[in-house]
Amino acid sequence: RSSAASDVYKRQCLWKVIGNPVMMAALQIPPISPEIADFIAAKTGAPAHGIMFNSDQWDGYQWDRYRLTSMIAKNNIKNVVAVTGDIHMSFANDIYEKFDGNMKGRRVAVEFVGPSVTAANVDDILADKVGLKLPENDPLFDTVDKALQTTNQHIRWCQCSKHGYVVVEMNRKFAQADWFFVNNKSNSRSGQHWGNSWATNEGTSALYPVKKPLKF
């Protein structure tokens, strides 16, 4: 993870892309007692608004993450984009220099996280571990998505139950990610549909929603 800092610093291209194995943005689980949250934050440096979802992500390597984000901020490096997999879910994230929960700090990068085509995510985990089998479009998953975004305000959009892939395209003006979801993960001929799109303009390090994909 620490090598990402030197790689970004040395690149002279317009877009500095980090091929990222695990989610960079903080992912906290809501909710816990404010007193407990403050205690954890004081002892560990973790964001004070939740408990980390997975310590194998960059949340478990917070000093390395801050080393990267502070280097980007200090050197005023523009157009850093992390393209991430592993978590099997879809996220569009603003990356801040510090993930302290108030979202008043400096944005230094963006992150596009792609889902899995067939590997387990939230709906499969509920079915396998709890025995609760729900369709991917069940309202429960919308509630989960909204709760994660409320707790993690740097997460501009997330989709935790649908399967598919993300296409990222970059040009001189912007970088855009288009998420597509398969209609039926058990049927390779079921087709696909567009899910959502987010983009960042050159020089801004901030995401905004897009009404349609670049290509389908």
Feature map (PLM): residue ranges:
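Long, structured stretches of catalytic cores involved in phosphate-ester chemistry, encompassing
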Residues: S3-F216
